[in-house]
Amino acid sequence: MSYLNASKNKKAPKTKKEIFKVVIKWLKVFGFLFILVSMLWGCVQMYQAQYSVNQIVDMTGKSVYTPGVSFEIILSSLGEQGSKVHHFVYDKGSFFEYGYNAITSWKETFKLTQSPFYGFFVYPTAWILAGMIKLFSGTLNPLLDKSSQLTYGISSIFAIFLTTLLIKGITLSFGWKSQINQEKMQDIQLKVADIQAKYKDKKDMQSKQKQQLEIQALYKKENMSQFSALAGSFAPLPFLFAIYAIVRSTRALKIASVGPIALIEGPWQQITAGNYIYIIILAIYLPLQAVSMLLPTLLQMKKQKSITLTEAQKKSRKKQLIMQVVMMFVFIIIIVSVATGVCIYWIFSSILQIIQTYAFYLYNEKKRKAGNQERQRRLRQMERMNLK
């Protein structure tokens, strides 16, 4: 089946509403490109010497993260106090002092980093996160006694949760339409698989262009955008990298711990060092990550259980499942090697993603059933009219 319109009628002039839609569309495209460029910029910048966060060797010979060295973000506008701490290391017969590079304001962030990633993502998110920590604990400069440290650590967990909730709301706005029309998007993907199967053995440029035009026509016919699904998938990534940078470099989180679990330490690194308490983090994270990534496909398979799929559609669904499993393992490998605070952020993010996926699934099922009932009602009404 072809979704191309053979009609060559002249296009009518665009209305103001249509022009407005085009403007919004291009703003979204430029916004998406800005986010993508910022993310890539940040990925490179985080590992440059002046922005890297390194462990120091303490007096016992143990490698640890500590405030007052390397790159650090201090939220002075929230009353946070911090400065360089003089740590030295003995190497090759000489003593060397660890470097220190601090940012204390939003203006300074743009001036020193000249980076949209740190300016628009890292510092504002760090300010919100640290502000919530201060709201719950009353301070960003906790005392060293166990009670104060525990209160501060628990406050940091709550702050990460609320920040995750805020980020989820922002990223959901990028893919709201595709989420609200999740069932339609899944049906479109099956139809796209059929179109791709139709042109599978055709390698000439004309056939490839025709395939792309058919796919575009299909999305247009269903009043859906290919971009919305793509933007929804990429939107969380800059915030994930921002949280990674924040947990490692923000003083407020460098000093945060809940009992023996420090938010800046990597769980896998600590487990291999004999601190098995960090297994708790991975035991919570791993199943949640698996469920959050596989749930959409599993729900789709459940819904389409009674539907007879074409061979191309079966292959497409299998390919989709394999890709999700691969992505799941990639995320698992990445997350277990980063700071515990990032793992906690991703635990909350996975929980919210599971709730979001299932909520939209229930919404779409309810909408589908209501539509079926309405169709049945109209059919019965037409039958009664025909009998008369």
From Swiss-Prot:
Subcellular location: Cell membrane
Stored NCBIfam families: PRK02201.1-5, yidC_oxa1_cterm
Keywords, in A-Z order: Cell membrane, Chaperone, Membrane, Protein transport, Transmembrane, Transmembrane helix, Transport
Functional note: Required for the insertion and/or proper folding and/or complex formation of integral membrane proteins into the membrane. Involved in integration of membrane proteins that insert both dependently and independently of the Sec translocase complex, as well as at least some lipoproteins. Aids folding of multispanning membrane proteins.
Source taxonomy: Bacteria, Bacillati, Mycoplasmatota, Mollicutes, Mycoplasmataceae
Subunit and interaction comment: Interacts with the Sec translocase complex via SecD. Specifically interacts with transmembrane segments of nascent integral membrane proteins during membrane integration.
Lineage: superkingdom: Bacteria
Protein name: Membrane protein insertase YidC
Membrane topology: Multi-pass membrane protein
A single Gene Ontology CC term: plasma membrane
GO molecular function: membrane insertase activity
Gene: yidC
Keyword Acyltransferase in annotation: no
A Pfam family of this chain: 60KD_IMP
Transmembrane segments: 22-42, 116-136, 156-176, 227-247, 279-299, 328-348
